[in-house]
């Protein structure tokens, strides 16, 4: 019996792990997103939905939609059905502030959420989970709050509309109607269920057990009486990475029992580390990530030294066999950030058939990322403490649906 259990544990440890706190592929391979869709029970975002987005918004779908960066969903079709009938919705996304500066992987949900806000003309709430990071990263409450404000500046620099956006820190905002919803959610979820969903153990502090309702209830409009009074049936759409799915599986399970609509989700793949696709970019390993604070020299150095290449060992071999695009990180990064579809296809063809060399692809990636980081740095430098206060002020947003 003991041997069976040991085999089971070893089998589990060699499987991919995807949860809000850990992302790692099986035996150093790639994340299997089809397997994740089956395991989590979400649906693949297909061409028909992307075409509907284009038709309803009268603008080209975002590059993250066109290239399946956002690839899975829950009830996104229902959000579009309602929108087509003239019913609006609101957006909810968030950030766990655990580092001074954001890396490019952190920017992805915000870049996409900004597009959704502009395309559909809807309000947005952004949760800064400074409480979560204080618990999981063992940061002091004060340090977590400071990082939340610093991260808010990076988020604001993405270009959100202050007349349609409310940013809040959990330490500052939780209370009142928000807290009432937390208690309602907490009463619906047993300890066994929470341990099953989130993998909590008897060694974890009870603070961890209390957190999931905090991330759940921003998807209920009644948690924001200053924004949505009398709009308890307003639907919520959550753009996030797929590792956040467990929180919202729980939320969707309890929402109907509380008389609320289930939140809809649109979920992204992970932005891979420079060294390869067996996990996601990590703020704890500075060489695995490109930061928004990196200089042009830093970016060039990191790409040239650390970006895993699918090119061959020698020029002769490369000319003959071409690059392996499946594992090539510079090509992966270009597929996230190079806007021009035809240029991307050209690079893939030339590089994949050996006519373009690794150095040329890395040079183009360096140009693209340097421009994005420089643009972000300029925008962030213009964000003042007064602007942060304005986004975080508890206030109505009278023109939020215009």
Curated annotation (Swiss-Prot):
<keyword id="KW-0648">Protein biosynthesis</keyword>
<keyword id="KW-0547">Nucleotide-binding</keyword>
<dbReference type="GO" id="GO:0006436">
    <property type="term" value="P:tryptophanyl-tRNA aminoacylation"/>
</dbReference>
<dbReference type="InterPro" id="IPR001412">
    <property type="entry name" value="aa-tRNA-synth_I_CS"/>
</dbReference>
<feature type="short sequence motif" description="'HIGH' region">
    <location>
        <begin position="97"/>
        <end position="106"/>
    </location>
</feature>
<comment type="similarity">
    <text>Belongs to the class-I aminoacyl-tRNA synthetase family.</text>
</comment>
<dbReference type="GO" id="GO:0009791">
    <property type="term" value="P:post-embryonic development"/>
</dbReference>
<protein>
    <recommendedName>
        <fullName>Tryptophan--tRNA ligase, cytoplasmic</fullName>
        <ecNumber>6.1.1.2</ecNumber>
    </recommendedName>
</protein>
<dbReference type="GO" id="GO:0005829">
    <property type="term" value="C:cytosol"/>
</dbReference>
<dbReference type="GO" id="GO:0048608">
    <property type="term" value="P:reproductive structure development"/>
</dbReference>
<dbReference type="InterPro" id="IPR002305">
    <property type="entry name" value="aa-tRNA-synth_Ic"/>
</dbReference>
<keyword id="KW-0436">Ligase</keyword>
<dbReference type="InterPro" id="IPR002306">
    <property type="entry name" value="Trp-tRNA-ligase"/>
</dbReference>
<dbReference type="InterPro" id="IPR014729">
    <property type="entry name" value="Rossmann-like_a/b/a_fold"/>
</dbReference>
<dbReference type="GO" id="GO:0004830">
    <property type="term" value="F:tryptophan-tRNA ligase activity"/>
</dbReference>
<feature type="short sequence motif" description="'KMSKS' region">
    <location>
        <begin position="280"/>
        <end position="284"/>
    </location>
</feature>
<keyword id="KW-0030">Aminoacyl-tRNA synthetase</keyword>
<dbReference type="Pfam" id="PF00579">
    <property type="entry name" value="tRNA-synt_1b"/>
</dbReference>
<dbReference type="GO" id="GO:0005524">
    <property type="term" value="F:ATP binding"/>
</dbReference>
<keyword id="KW-0963">Cytoplasm</keyword>
<keyword id="KW-0067">ATP-binding</keyword>
């Amino acid at each position: 019996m003991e041997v069976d259990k040991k085999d089971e544990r070893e089998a589990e440890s060699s499987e991919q792990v995807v949860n809000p706190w850990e992302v790692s592929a099986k035996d150093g391979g790639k994340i299997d997103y089809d397997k994740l869709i089956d395991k989590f029970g979400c649906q693949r975002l297909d061409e028909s939905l992307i075409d509907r987005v284009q038709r309803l918004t009268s603008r080209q779908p975002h590059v993250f939609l066109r290239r399946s960066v956002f690839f899975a969903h829950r009830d996104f079709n229902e959000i579009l059905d309602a929108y087509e009938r003239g019913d609006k919705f609101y957006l909810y996304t968030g950030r766990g502030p655990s580092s001074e500066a954001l890396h490019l992987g952190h920017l992805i949900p915000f870049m996409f959420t900004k597009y959704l806000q502009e395309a559909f003309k809807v309000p947005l709430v952004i949760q800064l989970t400074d409480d979560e990071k204080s618990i999981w990263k063992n940061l002091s409450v004060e340090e977590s709050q400071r990082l939340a404000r610093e991260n808010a500046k990076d988020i604001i620099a993405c270009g959100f509309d202050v007349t349609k956006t409310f940013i809040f820190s959990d330490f500052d905002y939780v209370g009142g109607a928000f807290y009432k919803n937390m208690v309602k959610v907490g009463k619906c979820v047993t300890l066994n269920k929470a341990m099953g969903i989130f993998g909590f153990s008897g060694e974890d502090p009870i603070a961890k057990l209390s957190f999931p309702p905090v991330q759940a209830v921003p998807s209920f409009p009644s948690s924001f009486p200053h924004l949505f009074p009398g709009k308890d049936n307003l639907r919520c759409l959550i753009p996030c990475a797929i590792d956040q799915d467990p929180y919202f599986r729980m939320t969707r399970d309890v929402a109907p029992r509380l008389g609320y609509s289930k939140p809809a989700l649109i979920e992204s793949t992970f932005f891979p580390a420079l060294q390869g696709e067996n996990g996601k970019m990590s703020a704890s390993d500075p060489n695995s990530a490109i930061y928004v604070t990196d200089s042009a020299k830093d970016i060039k150095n990191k790409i040239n030294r650390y970006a895993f290449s699918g090119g061959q060992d020698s020029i002769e071999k490369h000319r003959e066999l071409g690059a392996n695009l499946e594992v090539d990180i510079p090509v992966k990064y270009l597929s996230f950030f190079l806007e021009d579809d035809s240029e991307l296809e050209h690079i893939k063809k030339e590089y994949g058939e050996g006519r373009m060399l690794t150095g040329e692809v890395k040079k183009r990636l360096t140009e693209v990322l340097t421009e994005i980081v420089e643009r972000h740095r300029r925008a962030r430098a213009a964000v003042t403490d007064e602007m942060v206060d304005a986004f975080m002020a508890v206030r109505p947003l009278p023109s939020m649906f215009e």
